C-alpha cells in the first residue's frame, strides 16, 4: 500500500458522519490492512490538511444465504479522522 489512494477507498456519508463534520471529524472507508499512521499520512497527502487524531472501527463480514449456500460479505474498516482547528474543511459534495 505505497499509494495513498490505495489506502483511502471512499468517504462515508451517513446522518451521523455529517453531524461529525461540524466538529471537523470526517469518516472514510479504508483498506482493512491499513494502520492509523498510514491512514493519517494518506489523508494529509490527499487533502493537504493536518490530522490530529484517527479512530478506526473494524466490521466483520455478515453471513448471507443464497439458497442452501452460505457466503459472507467482505469485511471492512472505517476511519474517523479529526482535523486540526486551523485546517480547511473538506467538501465532498462538490461536482
From Swiss-Prot:
Keyword terms, alphabetized: Ribonucleoprotein, Ribosomal protein, RNA-binding, rRNA-binding
Record-level GO cellular component terms: ribonucleoprotein complex; ribosome
UniProt GO MF annotations: rRNA binding; structural constituent of ribosome
Example of a GO biological process term: translation
Entry-linked Gene3D superfamilies: 3.30.70.330
Superkingdom of the source species: Bacteria
InterPro entries: Nucleotide-bd_a/b_plait_sf, Ribosomal_uL23-like, Ribosomal_uL23/eL15/eS24_sf
Family stated for the protein in its record: Belongs to the universal ribosomal protein uL23 family.
The protein's role, per its UniProt record: One of the early assembly proteins it binds 23S rRNA. One of the proteins that surrounds the polypeptide exit tunnel on the outside of the ribosome. Forms the main docking site for trigger factor binding to the ribosome.
Assembly, per entry: Part of the 50S ribosomal subunit. Contacts protein L29, and trigger factor when it is bound to the ribosome.
NCBIfam families in UniProt: PRK05738.2-4 (NF004363)
Name this polypeptide is given: Large ribosomal subunit protein uL23
Gene: rplW
Amino acid at each position: 500500500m505505497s499509494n495513498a489512494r490505495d489506502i483511502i477507498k471512499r468517504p462515508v456519508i451517513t446522518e451521523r458522519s455529517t453531524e461529525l463534520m461540524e466538529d471537523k471529524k470526517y469518516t472514510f472507508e479504508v483498506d482493512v490492512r491499513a494502520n492509523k499512521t498510514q491512514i493519517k499520512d494518506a489523508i494529509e497527502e490527499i487533502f493537504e490538511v493536518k490530522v490530529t487524531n484517527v479512530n478506526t472501527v473494524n466490521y466483520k463480514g455478515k453471513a448471507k444465504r443464497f439458497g442452501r449456500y452460505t457466503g459472507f460479505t467482505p469485511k471492512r474498516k472505517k476511519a474517523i479522522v479529526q482535523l486540526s482547528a486551523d485546517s480547511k474543511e473538506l467538501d465532498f459534495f462538490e461536482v
